[in-house]
Structures are given as C-alpha cells and as structure tokens.
C-alpha cells in the first residue's frame, strides 16, 4: 500500500533539505537513510522509522511550487499509520511556521 502526503510550504529553501539535515529528526523516531545519490534525480531523500514502525518515506521537493511530496511505502500488509504519525508530529513540531497545508491521500 502507498500513501502520499503533500506538504505545501512557504519561505525560502528546500524543506526536504531542512528535514534531512535536522539533528533533532531522530528524536521523533525517524532516520534519514539516503539522499541524492549520483545518477538519481535531484531533490529526493528517504527516511525510515527508528522504532517498530514499518516502511519508508520518500521525499521529493518541488521548489517552484513550494511542495514536498512524501510517498509512504509499506510492505507485507504493514499499515503506515505509525510512520505517518511520527512524520506529521515532526513536521508540526519543527516546521509549523512554514507549513500552509498538509494533504494525505491513499493510493
């Protein structure tokens, strides 16, 4: 199952870059595992849960529209609620002033 979280942000700079470089990310149970490998498209990153939550969140920043597209991917019938909860908790705690809207869609 895949869930898409669309975050509309204001302000300058990449929200994806701010998330990946935030030293407090692990306090929310999230670990950045990959970002911008050579040969891959620019502006993407991946985070996993540091807790028992299964799955990963792929982050892609669209600078012109100020939109962060987050694809939550789980395997083997695991539900995404725990990792989504940790991620939304992190966004609202650390980047609330930049966030204009958060949309969550199931695919």
Regions inferred by a protein language model and the residue ranges of each:
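Intrinsically disordered, charged low-complexity linkers and terminal tails
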Residues: 1, 40-44, 63-69
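Terminal, regulation- and interaction-focused segments at domain boundaries
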Residues: 1-28
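Hydrophobic beta-strand residues in large extracellular and virion-surface proteins
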Residues: 5-7, 19, 57-59, 68-70, ...
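Beta-strand elements of well-folded, non-transmembrane domains
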Residues: 7-13, 51-53, 74-76
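Short, low-complexity, polar/charged sequence segments that are solvent-exposed and flexible
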Residues: 23-28, 65-68, 88-92
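Ser/Thr-rich, low-complexity intrinsically disordered terminal regions
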Residues: 25-56
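Intrinsically disordered, low-complexity regulatory segments enriched in Ser/Thr/Pro
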Residues: 55-81
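A conserved amphipathic terminal alpha-helix motif
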Residues: 78-107
């Amino acid at each position: 199952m895949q869930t898409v979280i669309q975050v509309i942000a204001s302000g300058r700079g990449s929200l994806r870059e701010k998330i990946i470089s935030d030293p407090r990310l692990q306090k929310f149970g999230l670990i950045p595992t990959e970002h911008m490998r050579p040969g891959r498209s620019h502006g993407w990153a991946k985070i996993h849960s540091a807790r028992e939550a299964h799955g990963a969140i792929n982050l892609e920043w669209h600078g012109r529209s100020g939109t962060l597209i987050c694809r939550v991917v789980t395997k083997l019938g695991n539900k995404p609620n725990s990792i989504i909860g940790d991620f939304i908790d992190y966004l609202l705690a650390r980047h609330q002033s930049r966030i204009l809207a958060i949309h969550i869609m199931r695919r």
